[in-house]
Amino acid sequence: QKFELLSYKKNSYIFNVETNKGVINTKNLIIATNGYTSKVTPWLNRRSIPIGSYVIASQELPESFISKLFPSNRHITDSCRVVYYFRASPDKKRIIFGGRVSSREIDLHDSAPLLLKDLKRVFPDLPEINVSHSWMGYVSYTFDHLPHIGQTDGVVYSRGYCGSGLA
């Protein structure tokens, strides 16, 4: 529901949590914001960096063609440091292809052609196709490339999945 954490304060055994939707009082506070961790938790921000991950969806393609590319209907991720991931769309009509296209944030109109070029590199026998959709989100990369899960001053945190599990 797009809750934004504005501040929090621990009083005895209760956290007073201020969000853009109002104040919440709770016994437990979990920060699971991954690439969207705010300045409210600077102790988490020092442990990782948000990196843009860009995704495209191809135009609709014949289901028989998609089935040849993804016969087991599995999600595929390469093992390079700059990761690409791809799969068939749930309706098996499009190729969903994503990854990091630049060391800096770039416009979606610029990222889509770059991803399409990489998609064609992965699947060189693709016919000429177009991109129908393009979007991006932030993933949290840790300096040791491992997820960070723990507890500090009663606040439980989980982040730094380095792109694993991106939908």
What residue ranges belong to the model's regions?
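A conserved short coil-to-beta-strand element within the FAD-binding core of flavoproteins
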Residues: 1-15
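Active-site substrate-recognition segment that forms the wall
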Residues: 7, 17, 23-154
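Short beta-strand segments that buttress and anchor functional surface loops
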Residues: 17-19, 160-161
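Conserved mid-domain beta->alpha element of the FAD-binding
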Residues: 146-148, 154-167
